[in-house]
């Protein structure tokens, strides 16, 4: 029988994470997450990346693969003293966030992907984008990237990483001003040129929106202004 749900998935993923750490005791949390996500297998059917993430965990690949692909990102958090600081962190997904419409231009934003080769031989990868089909369900609303000429490009379509080295690749989302407002999703596929069976994927998502309100002043008695209460 097939059983689903977070209560079943969580202990399975925790067990797989334990196997990864047993094989790689020096891994940090971001390394474990990247190992789980990079090597995940594509599911049958059409889903939002917010429903299935990178896909189905491949235990053997997650434990034994020699490559890691981590996205560098930032977030603003409260410093506990009434101010804010920029926190830099790594993850296994490309979250481009909200892209605001500009008149008569292509709207872009980018992130850096770090390709790390922990193996003993150099590897060359072909990099391409795969776009999710439009979805309009109760749980997901995904716009048609192909029909709206929305693209995700990388600074190089072919990337060689020397043994024991790391290489930075810039991923950019490009959204024409004429594109439909909405959510665009898909995957960046990374395939070993000499061995297509070695392949990895990074989910991506972005929202194309009209520019919203820049500043809001709230009444303190109604909504707290203490940053440690809502550091976002």
Labelled PLM ranges:
Residues 105-112, 167-169, 178-187:
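Short, solvent-exposed loop/turn segments enriched in Ser/Thr/Gly
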Residues 176-214:
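Terminal connector regions
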Residues 104, 115-122, 132, 178, ...:
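Short solvent-exposed strand-capping/beta-turn motif centered on an Asx-Ser/Thr pair
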Residues 142-177:
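Intrinsically disordered, low-complexity Pro/Gly/Ser/Thr-rich segments with frequent PxxP/GP/PP motifs
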Residues 119-147:
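Short acidic, flexible loop segments centered on an aromatic residue
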Residues 1-47, 178-181:
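Hydrolase catalytic cores
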Residues 206-230:
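Low-complexity, Pro/Ser/Thr- and charge-rich linker/hinge segments at domain boundaries
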Residues 59-120, 221-232:
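Beta-sheet-dominated interaction scaffolds and their linkers
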């Amino acid at each position: 029988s097939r059983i689903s749900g977070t209560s079943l998935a969580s202990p399975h993923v925790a067990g797989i994470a334990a196997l990864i750490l047993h094989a790689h005791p020096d891994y940090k949390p971001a390394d474990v997450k990247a190992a789980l996500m990079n090597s995940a297998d594509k599911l049958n059917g059409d889903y939002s990346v917010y429903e299935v993430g990178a896909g189905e965990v491949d235990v053997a690949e997650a434990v034994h693969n020699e490559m890691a692909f981590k996205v560098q990102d930032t977030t603003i958090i409260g410093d506990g003293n009434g101010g804010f600081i920029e926190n830099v962190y790594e993850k296994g997904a490309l979250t481009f966030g909200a892209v605001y419409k500009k008149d008569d231009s292509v709207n872009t934003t980018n992130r850096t992907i770090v390709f790390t080769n922990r193996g003993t031989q150099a590897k060359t990868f072909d990099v391409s984008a795969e776009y999710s089909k439009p979805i309009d369900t109760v749980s997901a609303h995904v716009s048609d990237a192909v029909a709206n000429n929305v693209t995700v490009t990388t600074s190089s379509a072919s990337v060689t990483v020397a043994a024991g080295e790391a290489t930075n690749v810039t991923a950019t989302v490009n959204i024409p001003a004429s594109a439909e407002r909405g959510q665009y999703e898909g995957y960046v596929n990374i395939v070993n040129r000499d061995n297509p069976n070695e392949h990895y994927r990074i989910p991506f998502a972005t929202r194309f929106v009209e520019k919203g309100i820049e500043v809001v002043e709230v009444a303190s008695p109604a909504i707290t202004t203490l940053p440690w209460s809502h550091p976002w």
